[in-house]
């Protein structure tokens, strides 16, 4: 949602999410050129102040290295101020390979590329039932007719729990949480050349401040 391209250090060791994050990060520069969307490899900092913060950052950095993430560096207050003058902190972990992307342009570029390669879109087409056939294909019932397919990819966002239920994979529920974005004027853009995060907790990455490819904060 924020348009941040992560470095792969924040995810559990050996997880699929970590693997795909590191691989996707490496691909992003070439992909941006090929599909013509905005991407800036500007880096990212996780800012800390306490001894506990430092220990957490060290663990985070080691986890990142185990995941294959590269160019991770612990920096002192002076170096942090040089990178992001508007941020106050005693130290930080600097992820050189992190960056930002225009999430709207990126999504549209992927959709256009998929369409050019034969993908068909059916908008306003709600899935109401899915039945697995004896030949291991699926009959998908929608508000605009039925479809038969060999594969079903569940990417229904907030509705993915309902799709899972239709496939007999029960027990997954999406617990929604509301987030607010405050967009500042482009005059503030020079104050923040890269995304800034607090030291992560066990539950989430925290509230961030980030620059955008359009020059806002």
Regions found by a protein language model. Give the residues of each.
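Dinucleotide-binding Rossmann-like beta1-alpha1 core, especially the glycine-rich loop
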Residues: 4-79, 83, 89, 206-208
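Active-site substrate-recognition segment that forms the wall
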Residues: 26, 30, 35-40, 129-132, ...
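Glycine-rich phosphate/pyrophosphate-binding beta-alpha loops
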Residues: 10, 98-100, 204
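Glycine-rich FAD pyrophosphate-binding loop
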Residues: 1
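Helical element adjacent to the flavin cofactor pocket in flavoenzyme catalytic cores
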Residues: 93-151
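General beta-strand structural signal in soluble alpha/beta enzymes
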Residues: 73-76, 121-123, 154
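Short, well-ordered beta-strand micro-motif
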Residues: 46-48, 141, 183
């Amino acid at each position: 949602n924020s348009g941040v391209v992560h470095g792969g250090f924040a995810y559990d060791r050996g997880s699929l999410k970590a693997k795909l994050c590191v691989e996707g990060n490496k691909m992003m520069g070439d992909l941006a050129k090929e599909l013509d969307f905005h991407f800036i490899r500007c880096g990212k900092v996780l800012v800390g102040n306490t001894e506990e913060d430092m220990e957490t950052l060290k663990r985070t950095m080691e986890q990142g290295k185990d995941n294959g993430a590269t160019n991770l560096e612990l920096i002192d207050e002076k170096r942090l101020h040089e990178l992001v003058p508007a941020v106050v902190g005693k130290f930080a972990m600097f992820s050189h390979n992190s960056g930002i992307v225009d999430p709207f342009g990126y999504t549209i570029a992927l959709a256009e590329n998929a369409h050019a390669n034969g993908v068909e879109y059916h908008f306003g087409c709600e899935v109401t039932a899915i039945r697995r056939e004896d030949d291991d294909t699926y009959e998908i019932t929608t508000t605009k007719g039925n479809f038969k397919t060999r594969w079903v990819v569940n990417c229904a966002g907030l509705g993915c729990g309902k799709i899972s239920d239709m496939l007999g994979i029960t027990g997954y529920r999406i617990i929604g949480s509301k987030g607010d974005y405050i967009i500042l004027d482009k005059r503030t853009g020079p104050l923040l050349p890269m995304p800034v995060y607090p030291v992560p907790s066990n539950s989430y990455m925290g509230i961030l401040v980030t620059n955008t490819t359009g020059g806002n904060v």
